Amino acid sequence: LLKSKENFISPEVQTQNNKKIRFNETLPSIDNSILDGHFETARALEIAAAGKHNFLLVGPPGCGKTLLSTTLIPALTPNMTEEESNVNYRIKSLAGLTGPHQDKYTAPFRMPHQTASIEGMCGGGVNCRPGEISLATNGTLFLDETAEFRSSVLQMLRVPLESKSVTLSRAGRSTVYPANFQLGLATNPCPCGNFHSESRVCLCSAKSIEQYWNKFSAPLLDRVEIKHFVKKDTEDTRKITVDEMKSHIETAIKIQRERGVYNSKLNPLEIAELCKLNKTCQKYMDTITQKNDLSPRNVANILKVSLTIANMDGREKIRINDLKEANELCSNVFEKPNQYKYNFESSIENDENEVQEPIRLYSAKYQKELS
């Protein structure tokens, strides 16, 4: 199994035209009441699961970020394909984690402790065993209380998030393991946890808050598409159920598996081909790109998330509301534009009659700066 990279690295997603999308049926049923007042957070996690996008949830202690993440993501992540399952089985075999009663197709949800070392996360040791990032392949690596992890561990994630693999070297031998995972982060907004709280006073200085967030680094946060501040809004009457979210995700995953690649894994050329915009959408992207000084990676994140939103609605074409919601989700968690609120009626807005054009201005930058 260790002879070559090809023993592990397989196509991003097995093309499936007729196979039904299934979810983990062994989990206990979820009480939809936990979503009351958390429509925005549920929507963010729904989109993250539908496109396998990396996500960051920020909020004060007790706001529900960990509960919602650990409850919804395992329930909303579709089961693996046969090919994905085979890759995971090989990894688990080398880690000594296989057993006769394990569900072969359930996507992994790994939640390492905050004291995890680089070796524990990346893998290594005498026999070059796979680490958490490899064990989470085709599933989710969730880091609760992210700020408590060592800075070196967090920075180590940057390369695997790009390459989808990790190379371990020991005693003159190199071993390549896959590390194709969805990254989920959850953290307090500051050391005391009350920054941006509407009901509590933050006791942290500006310097301590800056030092707190320096641990994450801009390059790491740039690789996280969805960023959301969690707070319970008792006045928000919008409702959504887990079954409705699964239906939306099933629609999106089917489109992506037929295409052969998940939206979060699209490369610059694929983004330019799939994310064709009409004049209204192009003008909107031009405006926010210039106004917010967006980098090519920021633009790519918005386009990938907007494509996922369109796919959840059964569409391949991106509409203006898809871009607005994606821009809201991809913005800095403390600098949200707060100009768009998703509702089922506004998502029906029809601008499909306009001619779709390949994205301009951005594709050349993608190829140069993201390749």
Language model features: what each stretch is:
Residues 127-128, 151-340:
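Basic, amphipathic alpha-helical bundle interface domains used for macromolecular binding and assembly
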Residues 102-120:
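Inter-Walker segment of RecA-like/P-loop motor cores
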Residues 55-97:
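Walker A/P-loop
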Residues 57, 80-83, 95-100, 129, ...:
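Active-site phosphate-binding and catalytic loops of NTP-dependent enzymes
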Residues 1-50, 54-55, 63, 67, ...:
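Peripheral, non-AAA+ core regions of ATP-driven protein-machinery
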Residues 59-60, 123, 145:
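The Walker A (P-loop) glycine that initiates the GxxxxGKT/S ATP-binding motif of P-loop NTPases
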Residues 138, 144-146, 156:
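Walker B catalytic acidic pair
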